[in-house]
């Protein structure tokens, strides 16, 4: 970057008014900003060596309103900057903390909306790898998927047989993300299954008795338990092979195949209490 380019980028950067800082850490700074009376927007400043420019370029091409709409990208001397639309709402983690488990019809509606976002990402070659309650915003128009900090572009040409760095949120990350295999679309399918399970139970998937509690939970329809088991099979080949297949299983009237082996997690005891009715959550959605 020459001096002229740097000055131009800094003039763009200075045009934004910072409303408040949303997050700050080794991976960069996230701010709520406005410009010329427009906004608010989210602005992320990522250290240049950590910037996944190809992921953000792919996201810019996505059309789903369940994904952030990228407004601008530019380069500072030591930062890659992305500006995208801000979606007001509550995360699924916050909703579960406040209300507990969701009614099955509400959980299915939300997971299908998240599937729409993930399916669009996959069509543009992006694997999200961090589909969690904290990374789903529920706004007036439904669910939105956020946080692309560990997303990557799927590389069919790569010679690697497995991921070399363990990344993801424990309990929601697929086994591949811990070095068992190479992540692909089926890794996000695993996370979608875990997320559906969380919405239906209000229990984080790192409890020692998590799977047994799901199996014994009469409030969760047996067909949805089967869908979750299918999506969360340890072996990627035993899962739905795409988000589209997962959605088909979700709405099918017949039970999906049950894998011989499920995934397992070490202990934790994080739970939420209570049950949110469909009408209560739909007031959030509409």
Question: Where is each model-derived feature located?
Answer:
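Conserved HxN/HPN-centered segment at the entrance to the catalytic loop
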Residues: 63-72
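Conserved short submotifs of the Hanks-type protein kinase catalytic core
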Residues: 77-91, 95
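Activation segment signature within eukaryotic-like protein kinase domains
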Residues: 110-111
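Conserved activation segment of eukaryotic-like protein kinases, specifically the C-terminal portion
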Residues: 161-176
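Conserved HRD-motif arginine in the catalytic loop of eukaryotic-like protein kinases
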Residues: 239
């Amino acid at each position: 970057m020459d001096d002229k380019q740097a000055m131009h980028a800094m003039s763009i950067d200075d045009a934004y008014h910072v409303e408040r800082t949303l997050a700050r850490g080794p991976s960069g700074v996230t701010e709520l900003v406005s410009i010329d009376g427009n906004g608010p927007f989210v602005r992320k400043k990522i250290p240049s060596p950590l910037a996944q420019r190809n992921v953000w370029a792919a996201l810019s091409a996505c059309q789903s309103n369940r994904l952030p709409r990228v407004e601008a990208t530019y380069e500072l001397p030591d930062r890659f900057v992305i500006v995208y639309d801000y979606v007001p709402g509550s995360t699924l983690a916050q909703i579960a903390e406040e209300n507990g488990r969701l009614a099955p019809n509400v959980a299915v509606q939300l997971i299908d909306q998240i599937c729409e976002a993930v399916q669009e990402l996959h069509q543009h070659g992006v694997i999200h790898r961090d589909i969690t309650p904290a990374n789903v915003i529920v706004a007036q128009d439904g669910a939105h998927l956020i946080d692309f900090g560990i997303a990557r572009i799927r590389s069919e040409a790569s010679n690697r047989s497995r991921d070399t760095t363990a990344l993801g949120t424990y309990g929601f990350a697929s086994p591949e993300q811990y070095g068992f295999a190479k992540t692909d679309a089926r890794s996000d399918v695993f996370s979608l299954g875990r997320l559906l399970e969380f919405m239906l139970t209000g229990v984080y998937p790192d409890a020692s008795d998590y799977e047994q509690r799901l199996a014994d939970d009469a409030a969760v329809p047996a067909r949805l338990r089967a869908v979750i088991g299918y999506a969360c099979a340890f072996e990627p080949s035993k899962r739905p092979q795409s988000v589209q297949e997962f959605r088909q299983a979700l709405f099918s009237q017949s039970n999906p195949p049950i894998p011989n082996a499920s995934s397992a997690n070490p202990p934790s005891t994080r739970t939420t209490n209570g049950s949110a009715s469909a009408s209560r959550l739909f007031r959030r959605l509409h």
